[in-house]
């Protein structure tokens, strides 16, 4: 399956651009996503996760099961109740909303660089008193030093112009004993470098896992519904590009997962000193 002309141009420019330009381009893309797709039933933007565990969900959350399961996989080994929690790259807010009502943190702030996505999330989830969304840059987090208990990041960091700066920012903002829950995809050389970035920032790695199979299983399960949703709600000239970014079957990211050229990872880390 072809990427679609907008996605091809976007990918080429990303490869040759410096970090600041890449940040601007991703911001532009996600602003466009938010404006083009304002349906209230489109609240998640991740690839999903499917394993042998059956997560108990409410009837209203069931249609988003696989997307919620990715969030749950990322944060399930830490205790969020009564804690101060941040999501970096909160998108349309579906994951943060579910975590805020399910795990009952004292306060959960979702930061995203798309002003339109932040606006939609604040509108949709205004009734959740422990949840808020703010516009923010992952490489310059508007957080005090040593102020947060848990920071999590889901399928977002591959967009950042300088992921090392992001990791250092998270370390700065966490309290001693605080956790970073991170999940995203990388090729092998880039993941090896990122592993060293985590260590060099001062994090102790509590656990790590390759979850590519579980993500692929989810992508296969929701492929037809994604294609149908894009077909019904996205302008004709953008359909293939949306399919590429959604990771539907036959697109470059999906095929890279299948071929073993891209892997999806999950890391749990602690700021030990």
State the predicted function of each range:
Residues 1-42:
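N-terminal auxiliary segments of SAM/dcSAM-dependent transferases
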Residues 64-81:
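Conserved alpha-helix/loop element of class I SAM-dependent methyltransferases that forms part
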Residues 114:
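Conserved SAM/SAH-binding beta-strand->alpha-helix loop
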Residues 127-139:
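Conserved SAM-binding strand-loop segment of SAM-dependent methyltransferases
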Residues 139-151:
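A short acidic, Gly/Pro-enriched loop at the edge of an enzyme's catalytic core
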Residues 92-103:
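Conserved SAM-binding loop of SAM-dependent methyltransferases across substrates and taxa
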Residues 178-184:
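Conserved beta-strand signature within the Rossmann-like core of class I S-adenosyl-L-methionine
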Residues 164-176:
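A short glycine-rich, Lys/Arg-flanked "PGG" loop and its adjoining helix->strand segment in the class I
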């Amino acid at each position: 399956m072809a990427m679609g002309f907008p996605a091809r141009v976007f990918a080429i420019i990303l490869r040759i651009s410096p970090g600041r330009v890449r940040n601007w381009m991703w911001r532009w893309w996600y602003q466009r996503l938010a404006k083009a797709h304002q349906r209230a039933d489109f609240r998640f933007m991740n690839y999903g996760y499917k394993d042998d565990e059956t997560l108990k969900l409410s009837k209203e959350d069931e249609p988003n099961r696989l997307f919620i399961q990715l969030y749950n996989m990322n944060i399930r080994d830490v205790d969020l109740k009564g804690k101060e929690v941040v999501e970096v790259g909160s998108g349309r807010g579906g994951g943060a909303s579910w975590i805020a009502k399910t795990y009952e943190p004292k306060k959960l702030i979702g930061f995203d660089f798309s002003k339109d996505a932040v606006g939609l999330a604040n509108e949709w989830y205004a009734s959740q008193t422990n949840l808020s969304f703010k516009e923010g840059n992952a490489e310059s987090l508007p957080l005090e030093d040593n102020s947060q208990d848990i920071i999590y990041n889901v399928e977002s960091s591959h967009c950042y112009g300088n992921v090392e700066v992001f990791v250092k920012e998270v370390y700065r903002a966490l309290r001693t004993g605080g956790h970073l829950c991170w999940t995203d995809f990388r090729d092998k050389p880039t993941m090896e470098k990122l592993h060293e970035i985590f260590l060099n920032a001062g994090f102790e790695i509590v656990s790590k896992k390759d979850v590519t199979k579980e993500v692929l299983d989810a992508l296969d399960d929701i492929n037809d519904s994604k294609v149908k949703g894009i077909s019904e709600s996205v302008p004709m000239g953008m359909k293939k590009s949306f399919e590429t970014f959604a990771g539907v079957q036959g697109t470059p990211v999906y095929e890279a997962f299948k071929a073993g050229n891209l892997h999806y990872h999950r890391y749990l880390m602690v700021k030990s000193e």
